[in-house]
């Protein structure tokens, strides 16, 4: 059974391992933990204001993540959307459940617009966001409060 819950400190190592494995080994993204200090300090980076970091688990195994940064001005940024390869697809619906929880939390907390950045090579993710009502936008149309990641090439927006 898949459960989704807010981040707890004991999950840190499992989250880091999941995300780095997907980034480096599955998609050959040239990024290290040193460039993602947010993963070593999740509570202070994500769990303030109306932001949060959710973890999907199968039993005790971390199999997915999603994070919301509260940027102020009724703007939220989606980060760290990852699902372990063996748990992807409609059979599990983990990515959809994670996004639904994030959007529900955003609406409850008066966040009106969501933004995210991703990589061109992550075509399944791009299709997922488009199916969920996100619109591709130019980098220069991002709000000034959007936290840019150097590796991102595609940017999306959704009014909720």
Placement of each model-derived feature along the sequence:
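Glycine-rich phosphate-binding loop
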Residues: 91-93
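Acetyl-CoA-dependent GNAT
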Residues: 6-86, 96-101, 105, 142, ...
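Extreme N-terminal starter segment of soluble prokaryotic enzymes
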Residues: 1-3
């Amino acid at each position: 059974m898949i459960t989704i819950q807010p981040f707890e400190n004991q999950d840190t190592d499992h989250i880091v391992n999941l995300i780095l494995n997907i980034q480096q080994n599955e998609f050959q993204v040239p990024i290290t933990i040193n460039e993602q200090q947010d993963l070593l300090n999740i509570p202070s980076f994500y769990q303030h204001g109306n932001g949060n970091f959710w973890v999907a688990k199968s039993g005790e195994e971390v199999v997915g993540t999603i994070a919301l940064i509260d940027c102020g001005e009724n703007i939220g940024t989606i980060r760290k959307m990852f699902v372990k390869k063996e748990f992807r697809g409609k059979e599990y619906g983990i990515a959809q459940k994670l996004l639904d929880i994030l959007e529900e939390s955003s609406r409850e907390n008066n966040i009106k617009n969501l933004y995210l950045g991703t990589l061109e090579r992550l075509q399944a993710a791009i299709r997922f966001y488009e199916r969920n009502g996100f619109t591709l936008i130019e980098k220069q149309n991002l709000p000034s409060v959007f936290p840019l990641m150097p590796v991102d090439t595609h940017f999306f927006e959704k009014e909720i």
